């Protein structure tokens, strides 16, 4: 099993690489790429950790050597948010970065499972899909926008609010991966009830949690460590699915035939072909149905931006 991380010298990439080095199955290969010259050194640093995961780093303009034979590609390359920016402000820089990297993925490892972390995810996933369509290698079951950070934040904040063991909290987060498009389905959380006020404040906190971190870091970065953990969880789930493990379910932003939008985050069953099945997200409350319906124009606009960028 070979996993490639593109953008591996950045804050998310280094955290993700560390977690993968310690958690990938024995015998796996971990390939790190970044434009930054430090990247081979990051791999050397991580290579001193005593796990049976072989690691190699690549720097420079061309990610191709890092991508050869990759089963899973996780893309975190791009610029991070600063105070006062929202995820869409990143579009102008990150759109081109994702397009260029996906062109190389399409040419080098077209059947790999690809997880996009680079923001704005609502748009960058659409860009990736269009690039792969142009290259004639698009498989909607192999492309994912990683929204796991919204899920782990929801789990954490619910457990804190209700004094629960966080390991017991399961929640679906649907929609997209920015602001109002992030919709945690709190009505489905088992064994707990929320007041209307709690639902409203918790939903808003989950939607704005990225900004909470950006502001707390006072210009020194965005959510890199928690995103690294979220991306590792999702990446390991992709690997487990590829290895034939049963019942691996994660929420992800996918081209899953949703009635709501061309791309939509919802639970998916993972397997040897990536998405084995897009799962229904279940019954929702009136609050959630309203929030879902009112986000769709924003989400569709984000998607159109990505499609138009490639065309």
Curated annotation (Swiss-Prot):
Coiled coil: none
A molecular function GO annotation: L-malate dehydrogenase (NAD+) activity
Keyword Cytoplasm belongs to the record: no
Binding site for substrate: 81, 87, 119, 153
Enzyme class: oxidoreductase
Residues the entry annotates as binding NAD(+): 7-13, 34, 94, 117-119, 227
Record bears the keyword Oxidoreductase: yes
GO BP term, example: tricarboxylic acid cycle
Highest taxon of source: Bacteria
Recorded catalytic activity of this chain's protein: (S)-malate + NAD(+) = oxaloacetate + NADH + H(+)
EC number(s) given by UniProt: 1.1.1.37
Family annotation (HAMAP family): Malate_dehydrog_1
PANTHER family given in the database record: MALATE AND LACTATE DEHYDROGENASE, MALATE DEHYDROGENASE, MITOCHONDRIAL
Family the entry assigns: Belongs to the LDH/MDH superfamily. MDH type 1 family.
Protein name: Malate dehydrogenase
């Amino acid at each position: 099993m070979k996993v490639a991380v593109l953008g591996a010298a950045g804050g998310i990439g280094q955290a993700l690489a560390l977690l993968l080095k310690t958690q990938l199955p024995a015998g796996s290969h971990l390939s790190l790429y970044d434009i930054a010259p430090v990247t081979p050194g990051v791999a050397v640093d991580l290579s001193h950790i005593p796990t049976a995961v072989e690691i190699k780093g690549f720097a420079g303009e061309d990610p191709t050597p890092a991508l050869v034979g990759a089963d899973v590609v996780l893309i975190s390359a791009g610029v991070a948010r600063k105070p006062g920016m929202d995820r869409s402000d990143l579009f102008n820089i990150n759109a081109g970065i994702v397009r260029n990297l996906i062109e190389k993925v399409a040419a080098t490892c077209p059947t790999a499972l690809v997880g996009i972390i680079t923001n704005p995810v609502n748009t960058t996933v659409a860009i990736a899909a269009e690039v792969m369509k142009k290259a004639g290698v698009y498989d909607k079951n192999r492309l994912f926008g990683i929204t796991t950070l919204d899920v782990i934040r929801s789990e954490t904040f619910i457990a804190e609010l209700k004094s629960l063991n966080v390991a017991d909290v399961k929640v679906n987060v649907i929609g997209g991966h920015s602001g109002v498009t992030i919709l945690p389905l709190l009505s489905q959380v088992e064994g707990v009830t929320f007041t209307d006020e709690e639902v409203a404040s918790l939903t808003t906190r989950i939607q704005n949690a990225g900004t909470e971190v950006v502001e707390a870091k006072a210009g020194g970065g965005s959510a890199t460590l928690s995103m690294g953990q979220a991306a590792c969880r999702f990446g390991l789930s992709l690997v487990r699915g590829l290895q034939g493990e049963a019942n691996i379910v994660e929420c992800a932003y996918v081209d899953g035939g949703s009635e709501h939008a061309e791309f939509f985050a919802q639970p998916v069953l993972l397997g040897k072909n990536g998405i084995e099945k897009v799962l229904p997200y279940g019954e929702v409350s009136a609050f959630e149905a309203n929030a879902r319906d009112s986000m769709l124009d924003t989400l569709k606009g984000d998607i159109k931006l990505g499609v138009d960028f490639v065309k």
